[in-house]
Amino acid sequence: MKYSDLRDFIAQLESRELLKRIDYPVSPHLEMTVVSDKVLRSGGPALLFTNTPNYNMPVLTNLFGTVERVALGMGEESIVALREIGKLLAALKEPDPPKGFKDAFSKLPLLKQALNMAPKYVSGAECQTHVWEKDEVDLTLLPIQTCWPGDVAPLITWGLVTTRGPHQSRENMGIYRQQLLSKNKLIMRWLSHRGGALDYQAWQQEYPQERFPVAVTLGADPATILAAVTPVPDTLSEYAFAGLLRGQRTRLTRCIGNDLHVPASAEIVLEGYLEPGNEAPEGPYGDHTGYYNEVQSFPVFTVERITHRDKPIYHSTYTGRPPDEPAILGVALNEVFIPLLQKQFPEIVDFYLPPEGCSYRLAVVTIKKQYPGHAKRIMMAVWSFLRQFMYTKFVIVCDDDVDARNWQDVIWAMTTRMDPSRDTVMVENTPIDYLDFASPVSGLGSKMGMDATSKWPGETQREWGKPITMDEDVLNRVNGYWSLLGLK
């Protein structure tokens, strides 16, 4: 599905009955979470709340509440096609050297397509139709959700944050939640390894007393949002990748008050800065783990300016115990990850991040095992290959006769092919999600790899068990007269 901006995407979803307008008054304080959660768990449509009490702005939730809608946002019609996007990223990330002139010529369209999707810079953008400055700036006029009863304050959840480090031409995009502090202040919660935090750290080293420019987009088009959460190669900007997904170049415009660029079709843009040394305690908030996170200090984002379109739409979500919207995104992006992994490790048959594992904390990998110790190599590969797997605590490796997406298969393999001492790998003092309160130190913890593959000579001194299977001829004969037995 091709679309020009968020509003076009909404219109097309509505025409397919994949989006529902809610005209009944629903409050962004807790009530929208209840409605959105019930609809998401039933596989229902995206929701546009048009009657938000005390606010003059509609709220969009559950935009990516099904895998189908994630695929549509990536310009595809089904989750199966997301593997092709993964293959595209794999080709751009690790291009194979051409085998000859004909092969080199065949690769040109892909490279040319990527190069031709560089952003298009425009002026007079629709996202700057209205401008609030100085005393006009009032974040409390936005229908920012309070998602859970124990949340300390309203929370921006779909803020697309643009930053740029010193001496860098490329801008970084990331999605970081932001706690409302006052009419013009938010808390920018980003983890230390994320692009925005790294840009800010580099800025403070270069300009220790100067303000760090930041722009936050609320209501970007789906391709731009999804590009920000996809493992785009460093050689390709997120905006260029968004253009590839959308089938047309991303239109960007320069912020009014700094040199950063934002999507021209964005619904709302917040312009401002971080002041070195200015931090505030953030949280607690209900999170994608299903728990409230602990309170930690993060930089304060001072908003100098708010720009927006005519009749802007506020894009929001909630996070909680899976399934939630991030979990659905994780299931879809799982299909993108597989070709990236297989490009480097072709012995991988399947890779699965179960949503109940908080989308990234546990991975199941099936392989065509080729030598003793092979499973341990794959564990290390998962932990080190993509930044997205830095916080994966558990990796279970199985043979290719196991369905990675079937817990009955996986548990059978673990309980019959594993010796806890021999087949468990523990790695200590590794990076761990700050939200993982189970780790002994904030941001630092251990990882466990489990080898649930059949063991080869050299890995065991015992004769290995042979799986029980029925004779094919007997199966076919019984299936032939099954209908005559009076059984279902």
From Swiss-Prot:
It comes from the Bacteria. Belongs to the UbiD family. Keywords: Cell membrane, Decarboxylase, Flavoprotein, FMN, Lyase, Manganese, Membrane, Metal-binding, Ubiquinone biosynthesis. Signal peptide: none annotated. Binds 1 prenylated FMN per subunit. GO terms for molecular function: 3-octaprenyl-4-hydroxybenzoate carboxy-lyase activity; metal ion binding. Catalyzes the decarboxylation of 3-octaprenyl-4-hydroxy benzoate to 2-octaprenylphenol, an intermediate step in ubiquinone biosynthesis. Its EC number is 4.1.1.98. This is 3-octaprenyl-4-hydroxybenzoate carboxy-lyase. GO terms for biological process: ubiquinone biosynthetic process. It holds the Pfam family UbiD_N. The active site is at residue 287. Prenylated FMN binds at residues 175-177, 189-191, 194-195. Its main location: membrane. It catalyses: a 4-hydroxy-3-(all-trans-polyprenyl)benzoate + H(+) = a 2-(all-trans-polyprenyl)phenol + CO2. InterPro entries: UbiD, UbiD-like_C, UbiD-like_N, UbiD_bacteria, UbiD_Rift_dom. It is a peripheral membrane protein. Pathway: Cofactor biosynthesis; ubiquinone biosynthesis. Gene3D superfamilies: Single helix bin, UbiD C-terminal domain-like. The keyword Aminoacyl-tRNA synthetase does not apply. It is found in: Cell membrane. Its cofactor is prenylated FMN; Mn(2+). Homohexamer. Mn(2+) binds at residues 172, 238. GO terms for cellular component: cytosol; plasma membrane.
